[in-house]
A protein has these predicted regions:
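Surface-exposed loop/turn motifs in large extracellular/passenger domains
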Residues: 8-10
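Glycine-rich hexapeptide-repeat left-handed beta-helix
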Residues: 13, 19-20, 25, 30-33, ...
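A short gly/proline-enriched turn/hairpin at secondary-structure junctions
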Residues: 4-5, 26
């Protein structure tokens, strides 16, 4: 659900927000999602910024004011309370950095988002 009643929500090209996810901002804290981002099932993005190519796992929560850097990976079920550096894996509650991601893993996250974009386009063609 994208609830834009208090603040703006923007979703970049090629990004996907999966079933049961919630996007919501507070005054002065919009939700900004870059290009080729995946927001997993039941994730909550609350007043946060997700930069290009990152992936937020199933059931993860990203809280107000946080920026998840480009190509970062937030593990399923994590609670993110602080900024995440680009290209890093974070996990836990609260989330902590576990390691730097190799370039291949970062590229795979973008490819994952692009596969969802192609799937959406194919469904749009079928339903015409």
């Amino acid at each position: 659900m994208a609830r834009g009643d208090l603040e703006q929500i923007s979703i970049g090209v090629g990004s996907n927000v999966q079933d049961g996810a919630v996007l919501h901002g507070d005054p002065g804290q919009p939700v900004r999602i870059g290009a080729d981002v995946t927001v997993g099932h039941r994730a909550v993005i609350h007043g946060a910024t997700l930069e290009d190519g990152c992936l937020v796992g199933i059931g993860a929560i990203v809280l107000n004011g946080v920026t998840v850097g480009a190509g970062a990976l937030v593990a399923a079920g994590s609670v993110v309370t602080k900024d995440v550096a680009p290209g890093t894996l974070v996990m836990g509650a609260p989330a902590v950095v576990k390691r730097k991601l190799p370039p291949e893993a970062i590229e795979e996250q973008r490819c994952h988002a692009q596969r969802y974009a192609r799937l959406a386009a194919s469904h749009a063609q079928i339903n015409r």
